[in-house]
Amino acid sequence: MTVHQISLFLENKPGRLAAICRTLTESGVNIASLSLADTTDFGIVRLLVDRWEKARDVLQGAGFGVNVREVVAISAPDEPGALARILEEVDRTGANVEYMYAFAVARGASARFVFRFDDTAKAVAALSAAGISLLDDATIFA
């Protein structure tokens, strides 16, 4: 089970991130999570949105270079050790975490972790077998 993540290369200039958010706002797309990794000249924006296909289309239409990737989203208890348990299950498979980020839904309710693995199928199988709650495009907003 995976979710669709929108990734964009972004010039490291004032107003560029706002332009992405404004474009999505004007088209009625809701952002669940945003991650920005930057260098001196450019950044990579990673988004989870409620309607990824519409987001892709409107961002491309606005001239942004858009890439859609399947990533693994996990819901876990908001408690010490939850992330460690997830990573231990993945470690057993030999899959590698290429990157990850997290966001909270409601304090004390659950935490959401988003992973890009070098072997998604292997990681998903191990996490599912361990009873870890995987999310899809519909449940990421639930």
What is each residue range found by the language model?
Residues 1-142:
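A conserved regulatory-domain signal marking ACT and ACT-like small-molecule sensing domains
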